[in-house]
């Protein structure tokens, strides 16, 4: 289904250029998957279309900084490079995406994986941010459960988390 034009590594990240037909398929998949996954993804994940992006994250941080005494900021090292394909595909299956989208994601993950590691995803790919959002959804759900009982607030942009706490 998808075909690569070329691939390269830069600063530890794997990048690819898809053939034009594949680029079109990925643009269409981004729209389709975005619609299918909209209700599945956490509202605290702001890089997803319609969730406010970086500006919403900055506004959130400014408001919370005035209300909470402590803040923790972290990002996940080698985020895209360390994603387990089987875990991601299971999450997509659980989210109920259609078979066409599922098969396209399988291609998207496997083609650049020349060493057959079963891990990693291209950085900067058109559907990588959306798939990354899916991959961290279990962590988002866990954080959402902690918010009321521990009086914490959190927000995520890609793999960057902000957690605010009173003590």
For each feature predicted by the language model, list its residue ranges.
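A structured, charge-rich N-terminal accessory region that forms the first stable segment of a protein
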Residues: 1-8
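Charged, low-complexity surface segments at secondary-structure and domain boundaries
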Residues: 14, 43-48, 87-93
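Conserved polymerase palm-domain catalytic core
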Residues: 58-167
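Generic detector of ordered secondary-structure context
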Residues: 20-21, 25, 53, 97, ...
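Conserved pre-motif C helix in the palm subdomain of viral-like polymerases
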Residues: 11-42, 117-145
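Active-site-proximal segment of RNA-dependent polymerases
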Residues: 26-84
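Short, ordered beta-strand-loop transition motifs
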Residues: 8-11, 159
